[in-house]
C-alpha cells in the first residue's frame, strides 16, 4: 500500500513542477513579446512578470511541502 503513496507523492510534485514550468514559459514568452512591441513599457512589463513568476514558483514550493508531508505520513 505504501507504494501507491510514493507514486502519489511523485505525481504531486511532478505535475506541480510541470504546470509551473509551462506557466512560467508561457508568461515569459508573452512578456518578451510585449517588450519587443513596446520597449517603452518594458519596465512595467518586467515588474509584472517577476511578480507573476514569484507566485507561480510559490505554488510549486507549496506542492513540494505538501508532497513532503504526504511522504512523512506513509
Swiss-Prot record:
The record marks 57 as: Reversibly protonated during proton transport. The keyword Cell membrane applies. Keywords: ATP synthesis, Cell membrane, CF(0), Hydrogen ion transport, Ion transport, Lipid-binding, Membrane, Transmembrane, Transmembrane helix, Transport. One of its GO terms (molecular function) is lipid binding. Its main location: membrane. Belongs to the ATPase C chain family. F(1)F(0) ATP synthase produces ATP from ADP in the presence of a proton or sodium gradient. F-type ATPases consist of two structural domains, F(1) containing the extramembraneous catalytic core and F(0) containing the membrane proton channel, linked together by a central stalk and a peripheral stalk. During catalysis, ATP synthesis in the catalytic domain of F(1) is coupled via a rotary mechanism of the central stalk subunits to proton translocation. Key component of the F(0) channel; it plays a direct role in translocation across the membrane. A homomeric c-ring of between 10-14 subunits forms the central stalk rotor element with the F(1) delta and epsilon subunits. HAMAP family: ATP_synth_c_bact (MF_01396). This is ATP synthase subunit c. It comes from Moorella thermoacetica (strain ATCC 39073 / JCM 9320).
